[in-house]
Every structure is written in C-alpha cells, then in structure tokens.
Swiss-Prot record:
In the N-terminal section; belongs to the MsrA Met sulfoxide reductase family. In the C-terminal section; belongs to the MsrB Met sulfoxide reductase family. Residues 206-329 form the MsrB domain. This is Peptide methionine sulfoxide reductase MsrA/MsrB. Keywords: Multifunctional enzyme, Oxidoreductase. GO terms for molecular function: L-methionine:thioredoxin-disulfide S-oxidoreductase activity; peptide-methionine (R)-S-oxide reductase activity; peptide-methionine (S)-S-oxide reductase activity. It comes from Helicobacter pylori (strain J99 / ATCC 700824) (Campylobacter pylori J99). The gene is msrAB. NCBIfam families: msrA, peptide-methionine (R)-S-oxide reductase MsrB.
C-alpha cells in the first residue's frame, strides 16, 4: 500500500510538472486568482505593449507571438509560423473590466484593416483577440458588435482561443522604455483619454433630487438658474481632484484642466472626456450662447465660450459650482474614482511645467 501511495504521488508530481512546463513553453502562465489575462494583437507589439501598460487596472503587459501554426517560433520565422505579434495583458478585474479594456484597444487599431496596422504590412501584423477563459468570448463578441455599429466596413479582428503562444525575445520586451523615441505606430497619449462608462451612472427621479439637492443646486441643475459669481464654492479652488455631476456622480471635469479666468465661476479648458457633456443652443438673455449639460443627468452645468487661453485649446467652460461635487485626489480611490487618478496626476504635472515656463 505504501508503494502504491508513493507511485500515485510520483505520477501526480510528474503530471503537475508537465503541465507547468507546457504553460511555461507557450508563455501562458496562469495569472493569480484575483487577476485576469487577455492577449491582443494590433500591429507592431512595441507600441501596443507600451500603450496597455499606461491603462489603469493593467498589472503587466508583455510582447509575444500568438496563434500560429507551430508551438515555437521567433521574430525571423513569423512568416513561416503565421504567428501574430501580440501583447499579453494581465489586468485587475476590480479596477477595469474586459469590456473597457477592449474599448481602449479599439481606440488604437484600425479594426477593418486586413494584415496591416500603421506602416506595418503582413500577416504578423493582423489584429486579434485571443482568450484563455471561455467566458470571455461573450464579452468579446458583444464588444465587437458594438464596435461594428460605429465603423464602416467589416471588422477584421480575429477572435480565437489562445494557442501556440510564445513569449517574444527579451530585446522586444519594454522596447519603448529601452528606446525612448523608438518606432511606434500608436499615439500613446490615447491611453490618457479616459473612458467614462455611461451605464455606471443613473439620473435620480425629480422627487429624489428635491430631497438630495439644496435649493440652489436644484434651481441651477434643473431650472437653468445661474449662481452668483465670486460667491460660489469652487471658483477659486486649487486643490487637486475631480469634479463630478452633483445629480449622478458622473465624472465631468478635472482640477488639471481648471484655470482662473477671472469670471467668478469655475473655468475649465475641457471636460474629462468629450462624451460626458452635451450641448444645446441657448438664446436666453437676448444673446446666443452654447449651454453645457451633463450626459446622464442632463443637468444644466453652465456655458462654453471660445475666449479661453489659446495654449489650452481656446475654450472656457464656465460652470456653476452648484452643479458640481468636488472629490479630493486623496479620496478618489475610496469613492470609486481611482481610474481617473493617473489622468489627474499627469495633467497636474503638465500644468506645473507650463506654469514654470510662463514664469
């Protein structure tokens, strides 16, 4: 019996070792239990890897070759093995969903181009989404259906279970970190254009709003009133953080885009994302203006004018403090706005550098 027990343990050890060796050889190590992995092909992997590493919620990104005909390959043999240059993305699902991660991916690829991205042409530069979790297939399919409605032409993104993955040579790993200014077909700044989910926020009923808001907040957001200049909460606030819709909590503006226009109301050069605000013509007060409203709450925020600083884009979003709630940078994570912290920090650093140059 002892011999039989020993043999069972021995064969189990061999089996586990074989599985680990197989996973290692294909570059598909399983992430930790609280992490997820997806493999994305989008042209030259140098740029896509650097881009993915900039996205909040991504734990690690590395370059490799996916879904070829053979279990081994290298950069010189890709035309023979038919692997796609791909990026292995390990991410934290508590911080970013697969759906949102794919939307960031879609921002930097041409989804209808066949075997070509940027200046790179060939099968190795095809687009593809390769999954190891079968449950991801439905998420991927739904994301592609939504994308198809937005683009002209048939989507050419390959979707398959991962197979024959090989980690790329060390020379290719973190290439743009090793070679700043090296070739990259992707605009890495697009990672800083934060995506704000529209299904994460809802507009309360009018009854709830009347209980939740102060009289001034209600009159401003629901009846398009204007608060007094220089006598409002945020017109001269300089603290780092995010400004959200007082009615829904949807992120609207960043302290990094706030500046002193001298008008007496909070002024911003742009919203945190172009989709979070809507515009309507306003001909009240016998003059033409452009009203700014929140996307989900449809709350009146203020107006936008074209007399802003040219170096900031030339716009002045003149917004009522009563339409906003400010969340300090130190509280953003615990209040569920952690994904916007990198945007705030990068923007504040850029603003600091610009201020130094101007003085």
């Amino acid at each position: 019996m002892k011999i039989l027990s020993y043999l069972k343990k021995f064969y189990l050890f061999l089996l586990i070792g074989a599985i680990m060796q197989a996973n290692e050889s294909m570059g598909a190590k399983l992430p930790k239990t609280d992490e997820r992995v997806i493999y994305l092909a989008g042209g030259c992997f140098w740029g896509l890897e650097a881009y993915m590493e900039r996205i909040y919620g991504v734990i690690d990104a590395s370059s490799g070759y996916a879904n070829g005909k053979t279990s081994s390959t290298n950069y010189e043999k890709l035309h023979e093995s038919d692997h796609a240059e791909s990026v292995k993305v390990i991410y934290d699902p508590k911080k970013i969903s697969l759906d949102k991660l794919l939307r960031y991916y879609f921002k930097v690829i041409d989804p209808v181009s066949v075997n070509k991205q940027g200046n790179d042409v060939g099968r190795q530069y095809r687009t593809g989404i390769y999954y190891v979790n079968s449950a991801d297939k439905e998420v991927i399919d739904n994301a592609l259906k939504a994308l198809q409605k937005e683009v002209k032409g048939k989507i050419a993104i390959e979707v398959e279970p991962l197979k024959n993955y090989v980690r790329a040579e060390e020379y290719h790993q973190d290439y743009l970190k090793k070679h700043p200014g090296g070739y990259c077909h992707i605009d890495l700044k697009k990672a800083d254009e934060v995506i704000v989910d529209d299904d994460k926020y809802t507009k309360p009923s009018d009854e709830v709003l009347k209980k939740k808001l102060t009289k001034l907040q209600y009159e401003v957001t629901q009846n398009k009133h204007t608060e007094k200049p220089f006598e409002n909460e945020y017109y001269n606030k300089e603290e780092e953080g995010i400004y959200v819709d007082i009615t829904t909590g949807e992120p609207l503006f960043s302290s990094a885009d706030k500046y002193d226009s001298g008008c007496g109301w909070p002024s911003f050069s742009k919203p945190i994302n172009k989709d979070v605000v809507k515009y309507e013509d306003d001909e009240s007060l016998n003059r033409k203006r452009i009203e700014v409203l929140s996307r989900i709450g449809k709350a009146h925020l203020g107006h936008v004018f074209n007399d802003g600083p040219k170096e900031l884009g030339g716009l002045r979003y003149c917004i009522n403090s009563a339409a906003l709630r400010f969340i300090p940078l130190k509280d953003m994570e615990k209040e569920g706005y952690g994904e916007f912290i990198p945007y705030i920090k990068k923007g504040e650093l850029k603003k600091y550098i610009q201020d130094k140059k101007s003085h």
